[in-house]
Amino acid sequence: MKAVVLAVAALFLAGGEARHFWQRDEPQASPWDKIKEFTTQYVDSVKDSGSEYLKQFETSALGTQMNLKLTENLDTLSSTFSKLREQLGPVTQEFWQNLEKDTEWLRQEMNKDLADMKQKVQPYMEQFQKTWQEEVERYRQKVEPLSTELREGARQKLQELQEKLAPLGADLRDSARVHVDALRTQLAPYSEQMRERLAERLAALRDSPSLAEYQAKAHEHLKTLHEKAQPALSDLGQGVLPVLESLKATLVGAIEEASKKLSSQ
């Protein structure tokens, strides 16, 4: 199971490199940076929207009577969560950095395979693009006189024009289907070859002597992450507990006061 997880992680990293290779984009942020950025944005969004509703409730008649201090409690929880995120950040980032380092050879091999595949496939893609442009130009030349006829003709000729365009559109679709099928047939051997190479790379990764060593490292990282998370989670629980107790006591007091008023009537 650990080997499967490691292989998926390696494919994730190698896949990111392959995407940059084909798109020629600048490398993006690390997975941990993306997770951290998303979490920060989500928590800030929830905090901002939640604070607005809590302030409205606190200023209401019921909120003033109950004196819940929800905004203050929300700030306390936000501070505790930020502390937890800061404690877990270095450990998780170190795990991703080690994973990228240990799978560097796999990414290099995959990039070589992709470069070789791109070189072989490029002529077919260029020919497909050239043929398709010729088909579109041929279609445009046939349609242009009909468009002129439409502009110069009356409305009663619209139906006739549509009838003339229908077979041309069908012809273009049929031509496109033929070219796509031909391209698919030409690329099929390369797709199969790429799948075989990927299987070989994964087999080499699975049989690598360093796999057991890396599994031990991953286990140690997870153990360290768990140990460092425990105090922060404990602090989070301690921060939430007073809020719940305060809310419970306030609600109980409000219920008792309401019961006394009903009894005295």
UniProtKB/Swiss-Prot annotation:
It is found in: Secreted. Its main location: secreted. GO terms for molecular function: cholesterol transfer activity; phosphatidylcholine-sterol O-acyltransferase activator activity; phospholipid binding; protein homodimerization activity. One of its GO terms (cellular component) is very-low-density lipoprotein particle. Keywords: Cholesterol metabolism, Glycoprotein, HDL, Lipid metabolism, Lipid transport, Lipoprotein, Oxidation, Palmitate, Phosphoprotein, Repeat, Secreted, Signal, Steroid metabolism, Sterol metabolism, Transport. Transmembrane segments: none annotated. Participates in the reverse transport of cholesterol from tissues to the liver for excretion by promoting cholesterol efflux from tissues and by acting as a cofactor for the lecithin cholesterol acyltransferase (LCAT). As part of the SPAP complex, activates spermatozoa motility. Belongs to the apolipoprotein A1/A4/E family. This is Apolipoprotein A-I. It comes from Dipodomys ordii.
